[in-house]
Amino acid sequence: MQLVERPRLELSGAKLKLVLEDLVARSEEQGGVEAYVEALRIKCAMFQEVLQKEFQLREFRALCAHMSTVRRRIGQYAQAHWFGEMKKRVAALLDEDQDTDERIRRFCAAFPDDREHRWARDLAAELLHHAHPERYPLMTRWVWDARTNTGVLRELWHGDDVDGMTIDVPDSYTTFLVLREELAQYLSSNGVFRDVLLYVDVLMAQVYAGYIGERGGTYLRADFTTPEDPMLHTRRILGLDGIDQDGRSRLKAADGRAEVVE
């Protein structure tokens, strides 16, 4: 078995401290961080229930509605004429007989290699993570995208001139494992002892929510509009706003209409 070298992640303790304090303060009036952890637990249960069986198109669409960077772009790939092929691709992705990075690579390679299909990486990452949250850390582009040098990893990187540097760390399975491990250790050292892995997801979403609020451009604001409350960006990043009070899904059809979840 080939040994994989662990990347060295130079995370800023000062930045982590500020993010955690901000997360606790912002979520206090909405049930605290625990409310978001519980919502993620429910999301994981939903994914596991669907993906462990012969799922139907409407169920796959419901999952997509809870993936913030997928639902507006997946379009025709969440329609009936594409469903058979999509099920095959998802089955291959979840086949644990192969290397994780290779499965993700093959899944993404089945789609056109252009800007309009970068969501495929996020779809793969969300399916893996929420089907097996302990085995697979969250590996979406907003956590770390080596090609664009953006994501949570960059926002937490230690240094005075992070904006002017290229972080030479691959967006591999091992990198995401190490990142989750270090964030989990930080949370544990600050009094979090239960559901630590889900807390890591919420913490990372809060990091990226701060990025959107401060520096997010047109691309980001298409998905994350002006917040109505201090935790709106965080909920959207985590996909916890998949269905509104009228039963309308955040999933967009090929013609741009919102799907209705039955």
Which positions does each model-derived feature cover?
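An N-terminal alpha-helical hairpin/helix-loop-helix interaction module that forms a charged
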Residues: 1-116, 134-144, 148-262
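Helix-hairpin-helix
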Residues: 110-130
